Amino acid sequence: MSITLTTVILFAVFGVLLFLGVPISISIVVSSIVTAMSTLSWDQITFITMQKMNSGVESFSLLAVPLFILAGNIMNNGGIAKRLVNFAQLFVGKIPGSMAQANILGNMLFGALSGSSVAAASAMGGCISPIEEENGYDPAYSAAANIASAPTGLLIPPTSAFIVYSTVAGGVSISTLFMAGYIPGILMGLCCMIVAFIGAKKAGMKATGIDHSQSIAKTVWDAAPSLLLIVIVIGGIVSGIFTATEGAGVAVLYCLILSIIYKSIDFKGFLGILLNSAKTSGIILFLISASSAMSFVMAYSGIPAAISNGLMSLTDNKYIIFLLMNIILLVIGMFMDITPAILIFTPIFLPIATSFGMTEIQFGVMLIFNMCLGNITPPVGSVLFVGCGIGHVSIEQVTSKLIPYFVALVLALLAVTYIPALSLGLPSLMGLI
């Protein structure tokens, strides 16, 4: 069977199953088995599928994923959103549209702590939206700022997205990926702040000012324990004191101590957090397991090489190739959640990127940046739907306000793609590459 037909069968079966509402993990396994039937015997298929699914989740570094999820869920229920909003207001309180600016800065901080864009949009939006409404903000303007900035936490570490990518990319250094995500994540946040500022100026919005109901020292003191988590975890991982997995364990312990100090979670609530974390972890780990089988089938069938040859037959200009990759990944992000997208398409596009001189680190940042944009676009944009629900606005109302953010973020994505120093500069400065 030709590689072209094999590729069509794989993605056609996968697409049909998704359209029918079959869970994505099952869709991945079934489409992989159907495709493998063209070249392997049934005994080989069952043995290899189980072997690859098992080996796909054997990596010790993957243990960091459920631990970071647990730490993030504890933080989400720990009442830190308000503390971070007050802290952010210290820096942006005198800027027009200051509450939107605080929302963006808060999302950058909260997303880095929780590692979840949906959690950031929900927590920060739920905290700031009522205050913005009291100050006469346009709900669509507020929701757009919240939605556009929430995915920054997928780039600013610690984030499980980089851990998943590291596993599927052949063990790329997690600490290097973490450092590589900082500048692009901050750039993403700055783009959102610039767009929010321009929108506020056009609407004639005034600065809300700094909340003086408590002292600056008290505001910093309240936020410091939460912010210290980033320093401890990232500092420990980068300095080699502990691995990413051990750092995730430290994060869980630290978050538990904070929740006890703040008295924000009771025993019943903690059991609920454990259950929710277990469910989320199970979904992600099964996705990783299933995608390992698909990756083998694609590699065995020569699909990545065929796609690579197809792209390179169009042009040998690396700038055009990178642009085409971005367009494809951006469309993929609109229709697929970040974890399965990383697992399925990294084996396809990473070899192409490296053959044109892009490092595994820069490609990982570019890939996840694309998925961040997919998070805020329909039809599968989870952050878009959560943000609209929190802001009590329809998708139609917020779309016109989101377009300037999307344009600015696409420009930032292109900068990350074509300026390697944006993702490689900090790791290089720290001696990680």
Residue ranges, per PLM feature:
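Alpha-helical transmembrane segments of multi-pass membrane transport proteins
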Residues: 1-433
